[in-house]
Amino acid sequence: MSTLEEHIDVGVPIDTVWDSLHRMEDYPRFVEGVREVRTEAGGRARLEVEADGRVRELEAEVSDRRGEGVMEWHTTGAPELMGSVSLKPIDENRTRVQARLEYDPGAIREALGGPKGFAQANAIERLVRSDLEHFKECVEQGR
């Protein structure tokens, strides 16, 4: 498994970021390739994802550790992905958002397409960074 960690500082209080993070139906606004998210009972979500010209549905289980400011998730089928988003208050009006993603490069390429090797790692890093920047914009603008 490969691991990627990225963070961004957002200019809103931690509770606002936490609430935005849990409005999964808004993910298509800031997560590239996510076309639709449907939340289900029991902490499950179905994501319709478009990658490399193909549309695919992924199912994920999501769990919270609100007291610690952590939301964790993992896919329940292929490709095997897992990650977390941790929130840390910088002060009363700013929050650090730390994203962690663990993935199998071969499984990602097989399921979603895209480049191999370092090119794949760089593409995923750019994608996560871009998604965090879009999340920041959405949260700070109250969208």
Predicted regions and their residues:
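Hydrophobic-ligand-binding modules of eukaryotic lipid transfer/binding families
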Residues: 1-9, 47, 123, 129, ...
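Beta-strand/loop substructures that line and gate deep hydrophobic ligand-binding cavities in soluble
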Residues: 74-130, 137
